[in-house]
Amino acid sequence: MGPRAKTYGDKIVNHANIGKLWSAYLDKEITAHDAAVMMALLKVARTKFGQPTEDTYVDAAAYMAIAGECKDY
């Protein structure tokens, strides 16, 4: 368990919870996989404006890695 997990909890559980909240808001099922991909897309969108930091790219890659881990949830 990494330092972020101590603060935010398990990444798969966290993205499943994000998916549940987005599902309720959108009235459409959003899976943990969907949530992780959409978080990566948010980071991609940020690269279009201003001067994105290296962290933006690292975060986008990390969200896609999480999406890979969540694909069966």
Features from the language model and the residues they span:
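Intrinsically disordered, low-complexity regulatory regions
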Residues: 1-73
